[in-house]
Each structure stands twice: as C-alpha cells, then as structure tokens.
Amino acid sequence: MRLTRSLPAMVTALLAAFLATGVSAQTVLRFGHANSPGEVAHDLYKEFADNVTKKSGGQLTVRVFPSEQLGKEVDLLQQLKSGALDISSPSMPTLNSMVPAFEMPSAPFLWKDWKEAEAVIRGPAMEPIWTELKDKHNIVPLTKIWYWGWRNFTFGTKEVRKPEDMAGLKVRVPESPIWVEMVRGFGAAPTPIPFGEVYTALQQKTVDGQENPIPTIFSRKFYEVQGVLSMSRHMLQNNTILINKSSMEKLKPELQKLLIDEAAAASAKNSEMQQAREVSMLEDIRKSGKTRIIDNPDRDAFAAKMVPVYVRLESRWGTENWKRVRAEIDRMRSAK
C-alpha cells in the first residue's frame, strides 16, 4: 500500500533526475530555405549548422531543410514570423511583403560598389527598418548580409547597350514592384514568370530576355538559350539569414552569440566565394562562344531612367527611410 502511494513520487524523482542530466538543455532549430544541395548557399548553411552543433557541445542543433521542402520563400517567411520555423534565408525583396522598405537595397543603380552597399545595409540608416521587422513581425537577423551578386540582363538576339534598345522587349521579372517598375522605366514590357519556368520561357521565346546574377545565369544555363549578355550590373541581390525572435530569446546568451558569430563567418565566406564565382563563371560564359557579351553598356543612361521610378516607389518605401539611406550614401561618397 505504501509502495502504491509512493509511486507518483518515485516517477517525479526519476523525471527530475533525467532532466538534470542535461538532455532537456538540447535545443533543435529548424532552418528552411529554397536552395538545392550542391549550391554554394546550401553547402554554407549546412556548414553553419554543423559548426553550431559542434561548438555548442551538442546543446544546440540546427536542422537544415533545403529545396523548398518546407515551402516557397514567401511561405517560409510567414512560418518564420509565426514561429513554425526558426531560421530562414530570404532575399531582401522577399521581405517587402512585411516591410516594403526592404526593397530599397535592390533599387536599380543605387550603389557604386559592394563595399558601399554592405556598409549602408549594416549601418544606422537601415536600422529603423530592421527594428520594424523585429517589432511588427517577431523576426531578427543573424546576418544582414548574404551576397548573391550583381544582376545583369540577357536577351535572345537583341544587343542592348542603352535603354532605347529595350523598347518593346518582353523581359521576365520576379513578381515584385521594384522589378516591374524598373523594366517599365526602360521602355520594355515586364513579364512575371516563376523562377523555375524561366529556362523554358526563354527557350520557347515566351519572353525576349531576363536578368539575374552571373552565377545564376551560368548554373541555370540561361546563356545557352540567350545570345546576348549585357553587363548592366543594374541591381544588387543581397539575401539574409533571419531567426524568429522568440526562438532566439529562449536561448542562453552564449548560444545566441554562437549563432550570430557562425552566421557572420558563413556570410564572409559566401561573399568571397560568390565574388570569385562571378568572375570565373563570366569567363566560362565567354569561352562557351554561345553568348555575345556587352561589357560596357551605357549605365549612366540606364541610371537616368530610374529617377522617376524612385519617385514612384518612395511613398511605398517611406519617404523618411529613402531620404535617410540616400543621405548616408551621399555622406560616404563625400567623405572619400
């Protein structure tokens, strides 16, 4: 009888002893993204996850789910907000569905070079925008920087050296206001097509052209069905690694720091690798002989066409946000 009465107490004591072993201290974070195994991004995300597990002594495990296993990029972002997902790596334009001002770093012809862009994205001019993401959507950055590259135009046969050369051409764009307004500003017809259908659309001449970073143009073999590559460098593509704020706050400070440090290390390695790939893959495209490369299109003429585009999008981004970013760019340039 006494044994029966003491059984709950024994179970409680055993459970407490089990928890005291530290098993309960193990935390698993789920990291969903859109890239495929074998791509640089996925390989670095996996390396990031492995380093976190190793350096935390097994206290923290990051499980990586590639290839849109958990949903498309926009879906992953919503899961990140709700806490159904812990970590993801959206592009800045994807974030515009939550905070439209995140489109600004992708504004055409905004940046002189990557160094300038990186400093502003990390700096105080963008801080209120990151704060809005945190306060309204429960999301914070592990790294604000994940260099993807400068986007360039490709076309079937048309040699595009100046905006007037694009008049009337159908150009594939992501379904995002900044891309639509940009292509329209050049006098072409923006045509939203899902990324997975771009190669077929080019091959079947559903559209005349598209734009992407060099590593994408090469790895997706767009250059095989496009006869012209115009090195417009019109837009910077930067991604991020973000974490659900509640997931982050549940971790001990030393584990929070570990995540941030390892994300920064992966980001730095990615920047170095991707910039090297831009150079080597452009050379591979050149050597293929399948694509004529226009190395020096009239970038000033293209940039001039973007002034009214900025005016149209300023209210979407927030006038104060846009003024603050432009002022920081001007300050940096005048200091040189």
Show the residue positions of the predicted features.
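Bacterial N-terminal signal peptides that target proteins for export
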Residues: M1-V11
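N-terminal signal peptide c-region/cleavage motif recognized by signal peptidases
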Residues: A20-G22
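N-terminal secretory/targeting leader peptides
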Residues: Q26-A117, A125-K336
